[in-house]
Regions:
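C-terminal lid/capping helical subdomain adjacent to the catalytic/cofactor pocket in oxidative enzymes
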Residues: 6, 86, 90-138
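Active-site substrate-recognition segment that forms the wall
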Residues: 1-94
């Protein structure tokens, strides 16, 4: 993402731009533009080209936005080779349950994952087949 400190234009609410799929978020110290994902290895160097694109799109969204202090950031998300999360019992340690690897869809998958984990903790059969998410697939 890219963050502009103390911009002249500041939205009061989060704004999602649907055509280019990015978000403008008002922060205490400025405005943050985010919304891209890049698949790369853990040792890959950051590619801030996407941040530059986000800044251009943000300036198009807010025409009065000027070049105030800019910071760029990127971080790793827990993504797995098959793009599915790991949800289920740890095969090696009793009473340990896994629920990770949702990548950039973590917030979307959280309610269903929470229900599955609650069912497993209570020794109930989950409402959906969790075979595609089993830890042993790797």
């Amino acid at each position: 993402h890219v963050m502009l400190a103390h911009p002249e234009v500041q939205p009061r609410h989060v704004i999602m731009e649907s055509e280019h799929k990015f978000v403008a978020t008002p922060m205490e110290t400025g405005i943050r533009f985010a919304g891209t994902a890049e698949l790369a290895g853990l040792t890959a160097s950051p590619n801030y080209e996407r941040a530059d694109i986000l800044l251009r799109l943000g300036k198009r969204m807010f025409p009065g936005l000027s070049g105030t202090e800019k910071t760029e950031w990127m971080g790793h998300r827990p993504s797995l080779p098959d793009s599915r999360p790991v949800i289920g019992k740890c095969p090696d340690i009793p009473n340990v349950l896994f629920a990770f690897g949702h990548g950039h869809r973590g917030l979307i998958g959280a309610p269903m994952t929470g229900e599955i984990i609650a069912d497993l903790m209570a020794k109930r059969q989950p409402k959906i087949d969790i075979t595609p998410f089993r830890p042993e697939r790797f």
